[in-house]
Amino acid sequence: MLTRVFARALAPEVRVCGVAPGPVAVEPGQEERRAAETLLGRIGSPDDVAEAVVFLAGADFVTGTSLFVDGGRHLQSMSARRP
C-alpha cells in the first residue's frame, strides 16, 4: 500500500517499487524447513534479490508495485496449496 501511495504522489518524476524478499539467510539447520516453505523448494540467494532490484531499476514503465522474490512463498497462504 505504501508503495502505491508514494508512486501516485511522486509520479512522473520518480518511480517507486518495492521488493519483498523471502528467506535468504537462514539459521544453520533451518535450510531444509525454510526451503519447504517455498514453491520452488529452495531458499533464495542474495543474487536472486539483487537481480530483482536491477530489473526494477531499469524498468522505465513500472511503478507502484512490489515484486515478491520469495520462491512463491507468498502463495503458500492461499487456499489452493501445492499437493
Predicted regions and their residues:
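Conserved protein kinase catalytic core
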Residues: 26, 76-77
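Alpha-helical segment proximal to the catalytic Tyr-Lys
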Residues: 8-12
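C-terminal substrate-recognition "lid" of short-chain dehydrogenase/reductases
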Residues: 46-69, 74
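A short, exposed helix-loop element centered on a Lys and neighboring polar residues
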Residues: 4
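Generic structural signal for alpha-helix termini and adjacent loop/cap motifs
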Residues: 41, 58-60, 78
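Conserved SDR Rossmann-fold cofactor-binding beta-strand/turn motif
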Residues: 15-25, 68-70
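Catalytic Tyr-x(3-8)-Lys segment
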Residues: 29-48
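A short alpha/beta connector and helix-capping loop motif
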Residues: 79-83
